[in-house]
Amino acid sequence: MYVVTPPQRSGFGSDCDLRVYQTWKGSNIFCLQGRFIFGPDVRSLGLTISLIVAPVTIFCIFVASKLMDDFSDSWGVSIILVAVVFTIYDLILLMLTSGRDPGIIPRNSHPPEPEVVDGNTGSGTSQTPRLPRVKEVEVNGKVFKVKYCDTCMLYRPPRCSHCSICNNCVERFDHHCPWVGQCIAQRNYRFFFMFVFSTTLLCVYVFAFCCVYIKKIKESEDISILKAMLKTPASIALILYTFISTFFVGGLTCFHLYLISTNQTTYENFRYSYDRHSNPHNKGVVDNFKEIFFSPIPPSKNNFRAMVPRENPMPSRSVVGGFMSPNMGKANDDIEMGRKGVWAMAEHGDGKDGNNNERFHVNDNELNELSPDMGNIVNGDEQINRPNNHPRNANWEMSPEVMALSARRA
């Protein structure tokens, strides 16, 4: 009998050479060694950047540069300068929204201690601890119901929800935005709204000066508005593009202005039907805006660059014959993902006396379901009953009846 040790991974020299982001169990993507955290759909961020930069580039080349001839030097340069600065500001807000911790709550490595017992209290009946699915907590004199998250193994705070895309519980979860590739929540909602609002203003700015350029062509050449539009196809394309974009991002801005004024999140707005009196988070319009834009942003609960000890593998079992159950790893994954892992581990014996008796650790109830006598024959702590006068190392031979029956079936 010997102990099977798990294989060691190469490339790691010490027990504390991993950082938090390297052992992260969520679906996030990290950049620059954990300095930036994105959602798993971060590739869409490139599309969003191109949808902002490309129209502004076309505007500066084909519209703003031509307007410099119609305005004085200072005004002509300022048209391009404002567009460039506004675009840079918009991209900074985009990165502040997408590349920071939105308010992820660190998951527990073990579930909390159960507080209730499920089961009969009669004699001979085992009591099974079970966590309540919902608990009531009091925050600032108000009672909230919090739910237990099987994946993160914690009770979610009020206004917290589990993002199925990032696989994290996030504080004051608003929604997961695929355009920025990140959850929108407590720590980046302010920047998200400013990004959407500034994008709306940028679209209006480009739309307005494209119209001004068409008007300048019409007045300078004394032609109809239609002919003036045909002389600058770039302006027509930008007008159509910015009009459609303003319809979407402008509508999103108005929607979030309503949410801020009532202190709601997108998740709460679609899931619950609050009125003015039932919303426990509504503090009034002024205080609601102060909470979003002027309250300090809480620090992150995660230090993604902190050094952590490497997680120890499953404790080595005393195994005979060098066999470990292949389901052990699957059971760990089931526990981490919040699923109930059901598996049985088998230990094979290889004694020195030549007997190869397999011993299975299974549930007695499962054995009784197979056969009432199975639980008495196969048990982790019992051996097959032998006659008292039977030698331990004797060979057990099949009776002639059994041999005949097996030969007939063959």
From Swiss-Prot:
It is a multi-pass membrane protein. Its EC number is 2.3.1.225. It is found in: Cell membrane. Keywords: Acyltransferase, Cell membrane, Lipoprotein, Membrane, Palmitate, Phosphoprotein, Transferase, Transmembrane, Transmembrane helix. The active site is at residue 177. The chain crosses the membrane at residues 45-65, 76-96, 191-211, 235-255. GO terms for cellular component: plasma membrane. The keyword Transport does not apply. InterPro entries: Palmitoyltrfase_DHHC, PFA4/ZDH16/20/ERF2-like. It holds the Pfam family DHHC. The keyword Cytoplasm does not apply. One of its GO terms (molecular function) is protein-cysteine S-palmitoyltransferase activity. Palmitoyl acyltransferase. The DHHC domain is required for palmitoyltransferase activity. Belongs to the DHHC palmitoyltransferase family. This is Probable protein S-acyltransferase 6. It comes from Arabidopsis thaliana (Mouse-ear cress).
